Amino acid sequence: MYTYSLLNLSHCRRQTRKKRKTDHTEGFLMEETKPKTVEDVETVDVYTAKGFLSTGHRYLDVRTNEEFAKSHVEEALNIPYMFKTDEGRVINPDFLSQVASVCKKDEHLIVACNAGGRGSRACVDLLNEGYDHVANMGGGYSAWVDAGFAGDKPPEDLKIACKFRPKEN
């Protein structure tokens, strides 16, 4: 039996680094937020992520459609952060607009890829876009499977909440 440490993501994220700047035309002191980096991304383990999902957080799977089709967390949103091309992997140019079409900026999101790398980079983009409650699931879907959380359902029986594909040329 596991105990879940359910923390509010807004409190466990690192403090935003801000610098002060004076608007000399109006004389107001303004705060300017630096762009977020991978160091600003909160990472949670799979047990914490599972606990968050049970309290209403959404699971954003940023793996490719092919990876997602093999197996995924039930009711996950699949919006690939990268696509495989003949030249290698390229960032999905529509990632942020696709996320915006199904997620509000104040929603709590658990972001995951296969091992954690793409997920953390996707979190950086989401944080810089104004999503305040995002966390990367450390170890990605592989860690989810290793923890024994993956179901034995065949892919066609799994519910798919959202799925995006690359644009056809």
Swiss-Prot record:
Protein's gene: HAC1
UniProt cross-references to CDD domains, sorted A to Z: RHOD
Protein name according to UniProt: Protein HIGH ARSENIC CONTENT 1, mitochondrial
Cellular component, GO, one term: cytoplasm
Entry keywords, A to Z: Mitochondrion, Oxidoreductase, Repeat, Transit peptide
Summary of the knockout phenotype: Reduced arsenate resistance and increased accumulation of arsenic in shoots and roots.
PANTHER family: PROTEIN HIGH ARSENIC CONTENT 1, MITOCHONDRIAL-RELATED, THIOSULFATE SULFURTRANSFERASE 18
Domain Rhodanese residues, every copy: 60-153
UniProt EC number: 1.20.4.1
